[in-house]
Amino acid sequence: MKALHFGAGNIGRGFIGKLLADAGIQLTFADVNQVVLDALNARHSYQVHVVGETEQVDTVSGVDAVSSIGDDVVDLIAQVDLVTTAVGPVVLERIAPAIAKGLVKRKEQGNESPLNIIACENMVRGTTQLKGHVMNALPEDAKAWVEEHVGFVDSAVDRIVPPSASATNDPLEVTVETFSEWIVDKTQFKGALPNIPGMELTDNLMAFVERKLFTLNTGHAITAYLGKLAGHQTIRDAILDEKIRAVVKGAMEESGAVLIKRYGFDADKHAAYIQKILGRFENPYLKDDVERVGRQPLRKLSAGDRLIKPLLGTLEYSLPHKNLIQGIAGAMHFRSEDDPQAQELAALIADKGPQAALAQISDLDANSEVVSEAVTAYKAMQ
């Protein structure tokens, strides 16, 4: 089996690429970073530090790389059995034209063996969004062929991969936590279902997408925002602060009550899942900076994301949300000189005031009780 993976960054190498290569799949990375491409093609291997209770070093081997903006990547799409991505939500649209060209070439070459494409991004139904971009880039006469022969498979991914603090300055070395979860929608595949250790198949993907978004992502973001306000440097430092931990755990329990109501998750199992996530945040080997985790606050405060979406669920089911409100207020305070969204957020609040600014970013009603609660919490944090 041959696979092409877009994105040779830390998540690409440390998570999805590693699982594919470990499964014995012939793997090629596609990226724009020439330093990383050259290193992968010179060595055909790299090291992954897997850290949890203990630390182990795994070697991923038998890999190569191509530029994601040249002809090589188009040729590969015409040949491979699987395409995966870990490029970030914004970049999906940029890689779509190359994928479309590759699919046209595949059709022209008469390659009718099934191809499955899986976007492994921190977003809800990312592959469906990628499919939209690809379809827009395809000529009309190729669309029906693509619908017949290409599966666009949505997935939920979960593994904390902080920027590498490698002492060796090796561009390929990466550190990841022991925990990993890659859940894919088995109803969307073309051809036989793949058997890849570490990839779980489900016919109820949205339950798992929201479980991860409402728990890991919600908890991670709130830890970062409250941690930064309290002067902590890392996620571990922040979650070991009892005041912050109480709010983070409370917020995950509030969002969890929505999940239990919506999808019928077992309450005891979900409580254990929350405990596991708190333990992951405490991992002493992961030097995960609160500023990195908190960046892009406008996206994280949008209606479909990790803070507002669970809040909307609590309103739908008339459930408590006081800790989620604390997290939203913390996000409104996020300031970073390195993050354009943080600067835009600050300017918006300065210009319109917190009430109108939050309503604009989140699509919540400016005159609603929840916006009023969030503004009160925001002002109390000043």
Swiss-Prot record:
SUPFAM superfamilies in alphabetical order: 6-phosphogluconate dehydrogenase C-terminal domain-like, NAD(P)-binding Rossmann-fold domains
Catalytic reactions of this protein: D-mannitol 1-phosphate + NAD(+) = beta-D-fructose 6-phosphate + NADH + H(+)
Top-level taxonomic group: Bacteria
Binding locations of NAD(+): A3, L4, H5, F6, G7, A8, G9, N10, I11, G12, R13, G14
One of the GO BP terms on file: mannitol catabolic process
GO molecular function, one term: mannitol-1-phosphate 5-dehydrogenase activity
GO cellular component annotations of the record: cytosol
Keyword rRNA-binding found: no
Pfam family, one: Mannitol_dh
Keywords assigned by UniProt, alphabetized: Acetylation, NAD, Oxidoreductase
InterPro entries noted in UniProt: 6-PGluconate_DH-like_C_sf, 6PGD_dom2, Mannitol_1_phos_5_DH, Mannitol_DH, Mannitol_DH_C, Mannitol_DH_CS, Mannitol_DH_N, NAD(P)-bd_dom_sf
Top-level class of the enzyme under EC nomenclature: oxidoreductase
Enzyme Commission numbers on file: 1.1.1.17
Residues that bear N6-acetyllysine: K269
Record note on quaternary structure: Monomer.
NCBIfam families for the chain: PRK02318.1-2, PRK02318.1-3, PRK02318.1-4, PRK02318.2-2, PRK02318.2-5
Family as reported in the entry's similarity comment: Belongs to the mannitol dehydrogenase family.
Protein name: Mannitol-1-phosphate 5-dehydrogenase
Species of the source: Escherichia coli O157:H7
